[in-house]
Amino acid sequence: MNKNATLMSHLQNAAIAVLTVTAVLLLIQTPLVGDLAGKTPYELAQDWLAGDTSTDTAVTTDLTELALPVRVVFTNEYARYGLSAITTLDTDFELAGTFFGEALGSATTYEACSGEKLLTALHASSIYLDLEAPTPLEVLSRILGVNDAPESSLLRVTRLVLCPAENGATLYLQDANQGFFVSRTAISSATLREALASLDGNGTDFAFALSGEFSQLSPYTLIFSEPPQRYTLSASNALTDQATFLRLAEFNPHTESGYTDSSGSTIIKEVYGTLRLEPDGSVFYQGADEAEAGSIYYVSAASIGKPTMLEAVAGAQRLAFTLLRDVSGDAELYLSEIDSSNKRFTVSFDYAVGGTPLRFSDGSHAATVTIEDQTITEFSLHCRSYTLSDSPALLLPIRQAAAIADSKYLSAELHVCYDEHGADTVGVGWFAD
């Protein structure tokens, strides 16, 4: 009898277990109603695990991580040594970066001067720094690691010259809108002369020192007897993993609020914004007027509702780096433009590959971010991935490029950029500014 009772007990327990498992299976396959209609608990759990956008996936950024393309010329008593196809992140820039960082950190009052004074300084011992994009002086200081530089109204600095003088080195700079300026610095002239004297020439010169077709160019155009070898790029759409992109952009990757239009673009509308993902990797966003702290769309500011220019650039950089940096291949991002009016900032970034800037044929940017108050309300992206190939890029010789520029432009400043037309390969060309 005891054996029968024990057997019955085991059978009852087994039956209860089977019924429990069956109930759970039925539950997870049962669609819910209301706002969760069409989703089973199991599917919701999957969505939560794979698509939780509450986790902070944004990268931590610093302005020193922006790879600003530059051209540098060291001039001593005997020769010039030039560098091109480098950025502020490259080791080849360290010497110039150290001197200009110290100069900007110790510069006193900037006084207006003539352009001839800056040009004259280039004839003697000096370091010349040419920026690919007009850059606010305050931002340039941060890029060079100077954290305590004073605020400045110079917003479009294009070139700088540092030269020895009697009482410390003198810094000249040009602002594209406001003209030329000069300032004393705390840099030892003896230290600067010693660094310059240690360098040998490499056949670099300025157009102002040359004759013939070069004399009609901008005097600041750099002529390299042996220009750096550049290579063609393989280019592709980097928006291949939409789920990951949506999660980084704080959208639900499993949302049912999206649709595909006749052009093949995916449009996703959520409460806080709308994303448009185009087949070629272009992305457009329009969002709410206010973002929550911690969101990728929130711009931190010391003064509520009034981010400074540096804070706006930092917020835009955080978004651009989060969405683009890990998928852009060999390309790096640099700040290429910033505009402001009232409480609105528009910050743009572009790609550089191997130290050479890349330009889109339609004049657009790799990323453009609009900030109002403390919220990113719009952005546009080119999600493109670039890989340096082993094939040398074909480039017209500088003399021929100069002859063509002379016939079309007045005092053109020539430099080399990658020319992006949306194809799967990208070459280089001469651009006149």
Question: What is the meaning of each model-derived region?
Answer:
Residues 1-11:
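Short, Lys/Arg-rich N-terminal segment immediately upstream of the first membrane anchor
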Residues 242-288, 327-375, 381-382, 412-433:
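Exposed beta-strand-loop-beta-strand "reactive/processing" segments of non-cytosolic proteins
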Residues 102-106, 146-149, 321-326, 342-345:
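Short linear motifs at secondary-structure transitions and domain/linker junctions
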Residues 287-339, 371-409:
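Long, charged/polar, surface-exposed segments that mediate recognition or autoinhibition
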Residues 13-16:
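Alpha-helical transmembrane spans
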Residues 3-4, 18-310:
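Preferential activation on post-signal-peptide N-terminal prodomains/segments
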Residues 148, 152-182, 193-196, 202, ...:
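Zymogen propeptides/activation segments of proteases
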